[in-house]
Amino acid sequence: MNVPHSVKSRADAYWRLMRFDKPIGIFLLLWPALWALWIAGEGRPDPGVAAVIVFGVVLMRAAGCVINDYADREFDPHVERTRLRPIAAGEVTSKEALILFMVLCLTAFALVLTMNWLTIALSVPGAFLAASYPFTKRYTHLPQAYLGLAFGWAIPMTFAAQTGSIPVVAWALYAATVLWALIYDTMYAMVDREDDVKIGIKSTAILFGKYDREIIGALQIAMLAILAGIGRYLGLGGLYALGLAAAAGFSVYQQVLIFRREKSKCFRAFLNNHWFGAAVFAGLFADYLWAG
């Protein structure tokens, strides 16, 4: 059966609005959730919990993209990189975007309802963080830090779902994830810095100014120190350390990429964070597997 072209076009617009054509954002959300899942489950996470966390991450990342484009609908047409986004280009209306956002959030909440009460309770501030983040760039130069709070919220939820509690190590991992989001989203904001200044959007890339590379470097060191401290606290071994060493290598490579602040290379540095997250998870996975 042939699908009408208009239906295909609409489906494609919704697909792009949810950024399913650009899965990097899913991975940046998913890796910390998987770190938490493996630590909370001591290398043997509950399959049901794992499924809810993974699908929940995918749904809420899509919801976050939709509400972000809704919030930025007046700005996106004036930025070269975002002017062809579905709402900015008139392919999807604001009303349709809000309906899609609600459907995605309700679907994710339906998944959470299969978990314990602590996880359900934690989903409320999580939804608030996701929905409010896009509006912060109007009022503060720290929207990237707020994004970290939103992206990292999967960590306490994962510990709650897996163990029924949120131990100190969960909050340490949350802190590392907030720093990580601050790092990679600042790299992302460096791409749009000139356009953002013109239209009045705030970001850490603008706030940090000529010290952006140095501050990113300090944040990278702090994040790696927290991750190393978590490994020591949990008694993890050499394989985890090897994963962290690989992650540190990716951090150095990212510094090389952003050295001249070229837009294309700043964007490559942002994308490279996928491999940072993968390296940390590989170290965790291998260490728990080796320990049996």
From Swiss-Prot:
It catalyses: all-trans-octaprenyl diphosphate + 4-hydroxybenzoate = 4-hydroxy-3-(all-trans-octaprenyl)benzoate + diphosphate. GO terms for molecular function: 4-hydroxybenzoate polyprenyltransferase activity. It is a multi-pass membrane protein. Keywords: Cell inner membrane, Cell membrane, Magnesium, Membrane, Transferase, Transmembrane, Transmembrane helix, Ubiquinone biosynthesis. The keyword ATP-binding does not apply. The keyword Oxidoreductase does not apply. GO terms for cellular component: plasma membrane. Pathway: Cofactor biosynthesis; ubiquinone biosynthesis. It is an enzyme of class 2 (transferase). CDD domains: PT_UbiA_COQ2. GO terms for biological process: ubiquinone biosynthetic process. The chain crosses the membrane at residues 23-43, 47-67, 98-118, 141-161, 164-184, 211-231, 233-253, 270-290. Its main location: membrane. NCBIfam families: ubiA_proteo. Catalyzes the prenylation of para-hydroxybenzoate (PHB) with an all-trans polyprenyl group. Mediates the second step in the final reaction sequence of ubiquinone-8 (UQ-8) biosynthesis, which is the condensation of the polyisoprenoid side chain with PHB, generating the first membrane-bound Q intermediate 3-octaprenyl-4-hydroxybenzoate. Belongs to the UbiA prenyltransferase family. This is 4-hydroxybenzoate octaprenyltransferase. It comes from Methylococcus capsulatus (strain ATCC 33009 / NCIMB 11132 / Bath). The gene is ubiA.
